[in-house]
Amino acid sequence: VSVLAYGTGLGFRAVGERHCVGARGNVCPLGAVVPGRSTGGRCAECARLDRAHSVAADTMADDPRTYRVYLAWFGPGMVKVGITGEERGAARLREQGAVAFSWLGRGPLMAARRTEEVLRAALGVPDRIPYARKRAVRGQLPGPEERAGAVAELYARAAALEGRGWPESLERLPLEVVDQVGVFGLDRAPDADADADPAPGRSVRESAPAPVRAVRELVDGGVVAGRLVAAAGPDLHLAVADGGVVVLDTRLITGWDLTAVTRATGATEVTGSDVRVPLIDIGGGGVQGGLF
């Protein structure tokens, strides 16, 4: 396993067909072929089995572990409430690509779940935000003070509901905004080295140009190659030959056989930054061919 670092190259070619990855560590009994656009990478039966054992399925009411309720901010107008196991720390927030967040409370699973439901209904926040919406705003994020202020405002609204449907067994935690822009590399210019900081006085908008295209799906023989400049949730932001940034949702990779690509100069060979798979415009519905 190779560790990816910002500024390093990444390249691979998809081979053959995409097969179901199975469920809960078990191989798919059907060896099913799954669609290239599926972010789950599972056939219907394996997806059902995987979902049945998740916290979201509410089949683990006697779970003895402690859970935390979080308030997450993904961009202007995009907030959500969720829960995660306390032992996981902030891993769930990184997996979702939360730009900033704060813990709200901690307690037993069902108390955390009940609080989550109360807050969603009272505050009018969704239970999930599509990744397409998250991608569309990553290059246009406001500054750190505005991000922190948005989380603090949501926290104040949520805390005001304590005692109004909020289970007594859920302990409220103090506001502590965690900003993950730096962790995700969204404050870096695409030509910066791995240790560079944005220039003094430059905003995130100026330091991290917005990606305008995303990989729609992998195909047999399709190539993705570029330089890693940011990573948020499952998304890798890759700088490519035309100076733009293409997003690769790594969930689209599961189930494929991949081979490494090497740099070459031939007309049909792969260069250091090629994308030869279908792309889709971020924030729109237009589909493009690969970049050459």
Question: How does the language model describe each region?
Answer:
Residues V1-F292:
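Non-catalytic accessory segments flanking enzymatic or RNA/DNA-binding domains
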